[in-house]
Curated annotation (Swiss-Prot):
Keyword Nucleotidyltransferase carried by entry: no
Protein family according to the UniProt entry: Belongs to the LOG family.
Function: Catalyzes the hydrolytic removal of ribose 5'-monophosphate from nitrogen N6-modified adenosines, the final step of bioactive cytokinin synthesis.
Residues annotated to bind substrate: 80, 98-99, 115-121, 127
Protein's name according to its UniProt entry: Cytokinin riboside 5'-monophosphate phosphoribohydrolase
Native organism: Mycobacterium marinum (strain ATCC BAA-535 / M)
Length: 187
């Protein structure tokens, strides 16, 4: 792994989000999340890309004076256009290592609308939280119902005993930014 600098000791929120779509509402949401994290004096840790929602969240955080830590696997440096403007850019060997660094660095997690990679990150951190590997807040910020199908399926799994109610309670699903940030706040 390589890094540009040392991160200040601040509350850190990992944001999991998309690396491909450029829907205006998604980019606006990601930008609002980045700006709000910075406004609170928190550090943003994200997937290290400078495209789609990843680029919007990090650019907005920096534009509002926030500290940004990008974590990107070597194989995606060019595909996701690594954000070399990050205050710290960690280049990992593998996707697994990327997720581990993000999880280790974060005090809380916010998931925005995204695809397979975003789901992978969410499910991984949720599973680890449920298993007691951490007690960090896991927030899904879903203002447009992007995750409604997933939530319905998970509810069915809980109803049939495949997912415990305790596991379901670990997920904090909100539809507005203020509630997401409140759920991530220290203390």
């Amino acid at each position: 792994m390589t890094a540009k600098s040392d991160e200040p000791g601040r509350w850190t929120v990992a944001v999991y989000c998309a690396a491909a779509p450029t829907h205006p509402e998604l980019l606006e949401l990601a930008g609002a999340v980045g700006a709000a994290i910075a406004a609170r004096g928190w550090t943003l840790v994200w997937g290290g890309g400078h495209v789609s929602a990843m680029g919007a969240v990090s650019s907005a955080a920096r534009a509002h004076g926030g500290w940004t830590v990008g974590v990107i696997p070597k194989m995606l440096v060019h595909r996701e256009l690594a954000d070399h403007d990050a205050d710290e850019l960690v280049v990992t060997e593998t996707m697994w290592e990327r997720k581990q660094v993000m999880e280790d660095r974060a005090n809380a997690f916010i998931t925005l609308p995204g695809g397979v990679g975003t789901l992978d990150e969410l499910l991984d951190v949720w599973t680890e939280g449920y298993l007691g590997m951490h007690d960090k807040s896991i927030v899904v910020l879903d203002p447009w119902g992007h995750f409604d199908g997933l939530r319905a399926w998970l509810s069915e799994l809980a109803d049939t005993g495949y997912v415990s109610r305790t596991a379901m309670e670990r997920l904090i699903v909100v539809d507005n930014l203020d509630d997401a940030l409140q759920a991530c706040a220290p203390g």
